[in-house]
Amino acid sequence: MGALLWSLLLLLQEAKGFSGDDEDPEEVIGVLQESINLSLEIPSNEEIKHIDWLFQNNIAIVKPGKKGQPAVIMAVDPRYRGRVSISESSYSLHISNLTWEDSGLYNAQVNLKTSESHITKSYHLRVYRRLSKPHITVNSNISEEGVCNISLTCSIERAGMDVTYIWLSSQDSTNTSHEGSVLSTSWRPGDKAPSYTCRVSNPVSNISSRRISVGSFCADPGYPEKPSMLCLLVKSLFLLLLLAILTVGLCLFRAQKSYETPRVRKLKRNRIKLRKKGKSGPTPV
């Protein structure tokens, strides 16, 4: 009986068609595995026979209850069983645990008791995933002219549709931006190193990466870096200090050598005298 009722109602909807097909559907944004509400406003002076919620086929057929009684859901598409509910006051459709397959065009057809006409409202549902934190990959090379060319690639896992990439740079106290997942830039070591942040967004989320400074990616030991005045001053002071230490050490070494030489000679002479005395032996009595 239930299957027969479902088939008859479906044929009836196809035969009637929809009024208001020329109206633009209401855009509705949903989040994957979360819930969405398709609101429905019905004039208070209209008596309702039944309401049909459709997506590809019928999702649910709702018959208002008598005074003080809840509405009766006469049929539910098996794909939505356990995931849909109807508002008692407005007959709006609530869908939980959204999937990618739920995206598309929905129609609410309100069939009136007073006439054969009906009120129709359309919705275009788009389902998106909340974005994860983006990751930046850096590739760099040094040209013959001494310029570091850098390519930054911003990526996220399971991005989905309608994702926007924006690069933000704070340099010289000004904020600049660049659109696209790949940013190409150049930098000469010795200049102030720029830093970048990738911001990704879709209709349901907005998240930024950690800030990346490109200075560390061009730190090549063989690169002809432009030394700063402070660096030159520190190096000069270090060399002067080293030279002073070497000079003092050499002077001390020479002074010690000149002081110890006569003493060593005297010791040698004393040793020779002792040896001669030992060879001559004791004096006879």
Curated annotation (Swiss-Prot):
KW Mitochondrion (keyword) present: no
Membrane side Cytoplasmic: residue ranges: 254-285
Spans within the Extracellular topological domain: 18-232
Keyword Transmembrane helix: yes
SUPFAM superfamilies for this protein: Immunoglobulin
Membrane topology of the entry: Single-pass type I membrane protein
Residue intervals of the Ig-like V-type domain: 25-126
Superkingdom of origin organism: Eukaryota
Positions annotated with a glycan in the UniProt record: 37, 97, 141, 149, 175, 206
Main location: membrane
Pfam family, one: V-set
GO biological process, one term: defense response to bacterium
Listed transmembrane segments: 233-253
Keyword entries, A-Z: Disulfide bond, Glycoprotein, Immunoglobulin domain, Membrane, Signal, Transmembrane, Transmembrane helix
Disulphide bond pairs: 154-198
Entry's localization field: Membrane
Primary role: May play a role in the immune response.
Listed name of the protein: SLAM family member 9
Species name: Mus musculus (Mouse)
The gene coding this protein: Slamf9
